[in-house]
């Protein structure tokens, strides 16, 4: 698991390879990831938007922006947590994701919190001899 804390808000990411959805012979590798956001701060916050930077093993970078996460803009009171799962396809057997969430505090001011960088790696990648 990968974790980062910004302004008392902890973001933890747990990636996992989705072998059933992947087709390595077609250069299609799919990962899921589970994100847990814990509000350890003293104020109520709302997740407004997300930004992801996804880099594959060839250095190709894809940027993803959008409002909320999985169709929601959750509000977290102090001590609350929120969890969601999503996925990411790549054309290479490894990559890296990193990002940030745009949050809004009780006073309406917006601020960013870090999503930790995490690696996407095929477990036990098989090697073939020609």
UniProtKB/Swiss-Prot annotation:
Protein name: Protein ApaG
Gene3D superfamilies: ApaG domain (2.60.40.1470)
Source organism of the structure: Brucella canis (strain ATCC 23365 / NCTC 10854 / RM-666)
Biological process terms in GO annotation: error-free translesion synthesis
Database matches in Pfam families: DUF525 (PF04379)
PANTHER family listed in its UniProt record: F-BOX ONLY PROTEIN 3 (PTHR14289), POLYMERASE DELTA-INTERACTING PROTEIN 2 (PTHR14289:SF16)
InterPro entries linked to this entry: ApaG_domain (IPR007474), ApaG_sf (IPR036767), Uncharacterised_ApaG (IPR023065)
Gene name, Swiss-Prot/TrEMBL: apaG
HAMAP family: ApaG (MF_00791)
Residues covered by the ApaG domain: 3-127
Highest taxon in the source lineage: Bacteria
């Amino acid at each position: 698991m990968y974790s980062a804390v910004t302004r008392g808000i902890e973001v933890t990411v747990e990636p996992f390879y989705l072998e059933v959805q992947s087709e390595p012979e077609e250069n299609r590798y799919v990962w899921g990831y589970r994100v847990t956001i814990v509000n350890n701060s003293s104020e109520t916050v709302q997740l407004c938007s997300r930004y992801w930077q996804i880099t594959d093993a060839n250095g190709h970078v894809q940027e993803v922006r959008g409002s909320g996460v999985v169709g929601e803009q959750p509000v977290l009171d102090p001590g609350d947590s929120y969890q969601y799962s999503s996925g990411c396809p790549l054309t290479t057997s490894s990559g890296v994701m990193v990002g940030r969430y745009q949050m809004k505090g009780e006073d309406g001011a917006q601020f960013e919190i870090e999503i930790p960088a995490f690696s996407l790696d095929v477990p036990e990648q098989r090697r073939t001899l020609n």
